[in-house]
C-alpha cells in the first residue's frame, strides 16, 4: 500500500516553527517510503483565511524544499462535506442543537462546580419535533456528531498504545450555526477521500483524533495510522504560543537562517538522536525515524539555529554563492578570493555585504591613542592599492624597519587601522582585496 501523508495548515497566518515540525515529519515519512505528500489548505474559515497566507505557506515550503505532490483546498470541497453530513444524518449519527454560546458556557461551569467533567449533556436529543421546529425558527441550529460511548483505542506511532473513553468526551460540533464546516469534520472527510494512510500532528490533537476515528468509521472509511509529536516550548520551558509572532519561518529567513539548518534542527529536536547538520534532504531522510521522537515537551531556542547556519554557510562551495557575490559588485577576478577570505568570518550569508563594504570602501580605522603616531608613520610607507599576495609582508617589514616595532605591537595596530577589527582573516589574504584604505599617514 502506498503511503499517503498530508500537511493541512489553515491559511489564517504564516507557518511557524511549531507547525513546520508537523510538515517536516509528514513530508519525510512520504518521501522516505516513496509515497505521496499532500498539501491541503484547510480554508473553511472564510473570515480569517486569506490568500496572502496561502501564498506565504507555499512560498515557505518551497524555500525549505518540502515539495508536495498534490495541492488541495477545503474551500473547493464544500459540496462534498454537505454530502457527508447527509450520510451521517441518515445513519443517525448527526444531530441538531440550539444552545447559545452563553448557555453552553453556563452548563460547562455548572458541571465543573459539581466536580464533573464538562461533557455536553445531549439535551438536544431529548427535544420533541415541535420544540426543535420552534427553536430552529428562533435561532440557527448547529450540528454535533453522536459518539458511540465506548473506548477508542489505537497504537500511536510516538505515544504508543492510546485508549480514550468516548463517554468522557463531548460530542464534537461539526457544523456551526452559520453553516461553517469545522476542522474536525472536514479533515475526517478529506483524509478518507484522499486515501491518507499516516498522520503526524501535535500532541494537543490526541482527543480530537479519538473523535475523528469514530467519524471516519461512521462514514465507512478506514482511519489512518496516527503519531502525535510533543509540543514545543520556549528555551525556559515557557509556552511557545505567546512568542510565535517572532518565530515565523519568514522572520527566521529574514534573520539569515538557512533552510537546511532549520530542517536539521527540526528533524532531530525532541528525538533520541543528536542534532546534526544535514547538507541535503537526502541525508536528512536517511537519518529520519518518527519512532525516535518522545512525548515530553520539547524546548526550542531560535539561537540554536545560528551555529547550524554558520556551519552550513562556511561549508558552501564557491559556485553556490557566485551569484550572491556578483550581486554585491565584487569584480570577477576577486570573487573567489573574496569568498575564501570571508566565509570563515560570517555567521549568515547576509554578512558578506559588510565584508565587501570593508574591502571596497575601506574600514573606519580603530587606533588606540598610544598608536596614533605609529600609524601615521606606518601609513606613509603603504603604497596605494591595488595590493598583491606579498603586500602585507612587504608593508610590515618596511614598518618594522622604520619603527623598530615587532610582534603583536607591530601587527595588531596595523590590522585595526586597515580593517577596523582586532581579529579576522589572515592579512596576507585581506590585502589583495582592499580597494581603499581610510587610515591616513
From Swiss-Prot:
Positions that bind ATP: 242
Subcellular location: Cytoplasm
EC supergroup of this enzyme: ligase
Motif 'HIGH' region, residue range(s) on this chain: 9-19
Enzyme Commission number: 6.1.1.17
Swiss-Prot/TrEMBL keywords: Aminoacyl-tRNA synthetase, ATP-binding, Cytoplasm, Ligase, Nucleotide-binding, Protein biosynthesis
One GO MF term attached to the UniProt entry: tRNA binding
SUPFAM superfamilies: An anticodon-binding domain of class I aminoacyl-tRNA synthetases, Nucleotidylyl transferase
PANTHER family: GLUTAMATE--TRNA LIGASE (PTHR43311), GLUTAMATE--TRNA LIGASE, MITOCHONDRIAL-RELATED (PTHR43311:SF2)
Homology family: Belongs to the class-I aminoacyl-tRNA synthetase family. Glutamate--tRNA ligase type 1 subfamily.
Function summary: Catalyzes the attachment of glutamate to tRNA(Glu) in a two-step reaction: glutamate is first activated by ATP to form Glu-AMP and then transferred to the acceptor end of tRNA(Glu).
Protein name: Glutamate--tRNA ligase 2
Amino acid at each position: 500500500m502506498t503511503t499517503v501523508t498530508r500537511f493541512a495548515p489553515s491559511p489564517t497566518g504564516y507557518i511557524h516553527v511549531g507547525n513546520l515540525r508537523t510538515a517536516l515529519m509528514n513530508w519525510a515519512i512520504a518521501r522516505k517510503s516513496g509515497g505521496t505528500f499532500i498539501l491541503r489548505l484547510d480554508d473553511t474559515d472564510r473570515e480569517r483565511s486569506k490568500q496572502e497566507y496561502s501564498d506565504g505557506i507555499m512560498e515557505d515550503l518551497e524555500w525549505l524544499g518540502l515539495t508536495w505532490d498534490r495541492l488541495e483546498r477545503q474551500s473547493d470541497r464544500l459540496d462534498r462535506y454537505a454530502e457527508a453530513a447527509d450520510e451521517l444524518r441518515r445513519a443517525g449519527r448527526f444531530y441538531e442543537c440550539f444552545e447559545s454560546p452563553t448557555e453552553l458556557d453556563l452548563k460547562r461551569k455548572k458541571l465543573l462546580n459539581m466536580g464533573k467533567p464538562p461533557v455536553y449533556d445531549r439535551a438536544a436529543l431529548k427535544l420533541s419535533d415541535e420544540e426543535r421546529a420552534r427553536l430552529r425558527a428562533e435561532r440557527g441550529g448547529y450540528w454535533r456528531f453522536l459518539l458511540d460511548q465506548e473506548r477508542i483505542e489505537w497504537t500511536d506511532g510516538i505515544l504508543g498504545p492510546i485508549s480514550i473513553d468516548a463517554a468522557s468526551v463531548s460530542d464534537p460540533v461539526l457544523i456551526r450555526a452559520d453553516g461553517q464546516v469545522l476542522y474536525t469534520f472536514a479533515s475526517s472527510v478529506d483524509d478518507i477521500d484522499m486515501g491518507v494512510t499516516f498522520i503526524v500532528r501535535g500532541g494537543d490533537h490526541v482527543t480530537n483524533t479519538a473523535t475523528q476515528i469514530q467519524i471516519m468509521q461512521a462514514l465507512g472509511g478506514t482511519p489512518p495510522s496516527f503519531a502525535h509529536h510533543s509540543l514545543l516550548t520556549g528555551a525556559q520551558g515557557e509556552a511557545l504560543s505567546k512568542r510565535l509572532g517572532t518565530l515565523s519561518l519568514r522572520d527566521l529567513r529574514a534573520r539569515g537562517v538557512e533552510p537546511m539548518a532549520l530542517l536539521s534542527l527540526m528533524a532531530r529536536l525532541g528525538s533520541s538522536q543528536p542534532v546534526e547538520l544535514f547538507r541535503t534532504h537526502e541525508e536528512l531522510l536517511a537519518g529520519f525515524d518518527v519512532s525516535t521522537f518522545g512525548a515530553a515537551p520539547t524546548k526550542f531556542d531560535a539561537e540554536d539555529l545560528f551555529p547550524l547556519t554558520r556551519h552550513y554557510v562556511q561549508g558552501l562551495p564557491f559556485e553556490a554563492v557566485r551569484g550572491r557575490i556578483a550581486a554585491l559588485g565584487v569584480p570577477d577576478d576577486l570573487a573567489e578570493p573574496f569568498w575564501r577570505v570571508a566565509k570563515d568570518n560570517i555567521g549568515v550569508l547576509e554578512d558578506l555585504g559588510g565584508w565587501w563594504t570593508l574591502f571596497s570602501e575601506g574600514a573606519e580605522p580603530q587606533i588606540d591613542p598610544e598608536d596614533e603616531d605609529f600609524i601615521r608613520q606606518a601609513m606613509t610607507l603603504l603604497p596605494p592599492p591595488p595590493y598583491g599576495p606579498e603586500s602585507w609582508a612587504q608593508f610590515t617589514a618596511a614598518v618594522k624597519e622604520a619603527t623598530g616595532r615587532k610582534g603583536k605591537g607591530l601587527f595588531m595596530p596595523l590590522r585595526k587601522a586597515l580593517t577596523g577589527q582586532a581579529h579576522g582573516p589572515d592579512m596576507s589574504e585581506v590585502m589583495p582585496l582592499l580597494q581603499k584604505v581610510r587610515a591616513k599617514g
